[in-house]
Each structure stands twice: as structure tokens, then as C-alpha cells.
Amino acid sequence: MIDRHHTVTFTGHRTYCGEADEALRQAIVRLVQQGYTTFLSGMALGFDLAAAEQVLQLRREGVLLRLVAVIPFRGQERSYSDEERARYCRVVAEADEVITLAEQFHRGAYQVRNDYLVSHASYLVAWYNGSKGGTQYTFLKGLKCGLALENLATFQLLDQRLFQ
């Protein structure tokens, strides 16, 4: 069972290419020091997988934390390249828990996953650059639901109308 008060979730763009890996690592270490023990990844390419890999690396180094892979539907990785699929499967194999929300793809599968992430955490670490899509949805939902938010994106010119 996930204790949301000690749980962090991640959201970020699929275009993430490691730009904030060190800041991400530092954020995870700091959050563990603050008492967060469980980290949720939605397992999408880009920031989600990078965040999951950081959690796993820290766990290998002896940091006491858990990774929960939250998969929107069985077979999510089928459309990935061979290299991306291998990376995804390594993370799933090393995760402390795997939660699959649906047996097959359906319209809204990613939104259901994003809602799950927000409703099971109290802290959200994002790589959000202000563009529309699932990351924006999750970021704004986290804001609306009162999660503590940390945005690692260097893009600082977020449209303030998003927060009104």
C-alpha cells in the first residue's frame, strides 16, 4: 500500500534528454532526507524513465527508497524501439512494485495513469516547459490538488495564465 504522505511522483516531457539529471538526483536525495520513501514513475519515455533510473541508481548505492512503476496499460512498451524497450524492461524488472492500471490501451489510459500518480503522492517533481500535453495536465492537476511542486526545467517563462 502506498502512503501518499511519504510519496513523490514524477512528470515530464518525453523529449527530456538528461538536461537535469544532476538536479534530479539531488532532488531525490533531499526528498529522502525529508522522509519521502516511495517514488512513482508513469514509465513514459523521457523524464519518467530517467527519474525511475535515478531512483534505482540511488537504491543500488544504499539509499533507502522504493520505486513503484505505474503502467497505464499492459504492453505500453510495444511501440518503443528495441533500445527503449530494453531500458523500460530493465526498470520494470528492478522496480519494487509494478502497478498496471488496464489490461489494454483505451482512450484516456494516460490520463487515468496521470490521475493515479497525483492522487497517490504528496510531492511532484516535474520537467515541465510550459507546453500543452500530459505533463501540463499532471502538473496543473498536482497544483490544484495541493501537491508540493518542484519544476526542474530550466525554462522559466511559464504562461502565468495556466495558474489562474
Give the predicted meaning of each segment.
Residues 1-164:
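Acidic/glycine-enriched connector segments
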